[in-house]
Structure formats: C-alpha cells, structure tokens
C-alpha cells in the first residue's frame, strides 16, 4: 500500500517501511555517509535543524555513533516541516528513499538500509514538543555547533546540559539499550499551575 505526501512540487507516493527499536544495529560507515550527505543538503537551506537524542549523545561522548544505536536523530522546527518535505526529490537524487511519515511528528528517510529520523518539534508553553518529548526553550534559544566527522553540525544550545536533562546526570556512562526517555514535564507543569490560574481568574472577575 502506498502513502502520499503533499509537497509544493506535487504529490509524492511511497511505500512505508516498518521501522522499530531493536530491528538492527547501526552500520557506522553507511550512517556516516548518510549524515554527511544530509549536512551537505541541509546546509544550503534555511531550515532550522540539528543533532539530537542518541546521535548527539554519541557525537559528544563517543565522537562517533553509539555502537548499539539504530538510526540518526535530527530535530526540525515544526515551522520548517514543509521545507523538509519539499526536499524529498533532492534526497532522492542522493539515493535516499522515504521510509515513513507521521504528519505532525516524524519523517524518516533511508539509504543503504540506514535511516534518518526527523522529529518535528512544535512550539508549546516554555518549550517545544514532539510526540512525548518536551524540551525547554533554553535549549532552542540559540543553536550551537559541534564537530562530528571533521565537519560542523548544528545542535541544541548548551548540549551537555541538554543531555543531562534528557538522559540524567550519568549520561556520560554508556548503557546498552538505553534510549531517550519520553517526558511529560509540560503536562505536569500545566496541571500544577492550572488551579492557581483558575483562582486568579475568579479573583479578577469578582473584584
């Protein structure tokens, strides 16, 4: 069954590939080729993107991909989602195929059996969210650069603090099968302040 992605250049049809954790281990050589190709393509655009999750963790801690990782993780500002989709045909020129597309959250491309996940982070209260991953604004405030495979890649501001936020204070210790944990900080925060906001509203209304 084919899926359809609507772009400014027309409809793009593709057959989705079933991707899931535990399917395989990353091939570092092929993944390196892919991430360098991706950098070359995106560096010619104004798309806001960068390394995140396990790819950023590996770049800082191992100076390489994590041996038990499975893919490449990239964040994209949700506002730039359509710009990424418009690059599908450009990705095709370099041998990438579309593997999956979840309209509001995730887009994946694959080349030589190694895939890249693009996470669309949408503006929320005090931060950005994709799926169940919430990241405070301070990490998106200014993009930073990190040297990876002798090239500079964009990433989150204050990357070491972000990794502590995402993985805990022991993020420097390698752990097999330890993935970025979804967090629901923003939900808890809203629930905690909501009663106060309601009380303030009623006070303002009645005085």
Region spans (language model):
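Active-site nucleotide-donor binding segment shared across nucleotidyl transfer reactions
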Residues: 39-72
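Metal-dependent nucleotidyltransferase catalytic core
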Residues: 27-34, 76-103, 108-109
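Non-catalytic N-terminal targeting/anchoring module and adjacent flexible stem/linker
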Residues: 1-2, 86-90, 204-207
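Residues that flank catalytic or metal-binding motifs in active/ligand-binding sites
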Residues: 68-72, 103-105, 112-115, 142, ...
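Catalytic metal-binding acidic patch
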Residues: 63-83, 150
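Catalytic cores of NTP-dependent nucleotidyl/adenyl transfer enzymes across multiple folds
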Residues: 7-17, 28, 32, 120-207
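Helical scaffold of the NTase/Pol beta-like nucleotidyltransferase catalytic core
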Residues: 1-52
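Conserved catalytic core of nucleotide-sugar-dependent glycosyltransferases
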Residues: 104-129
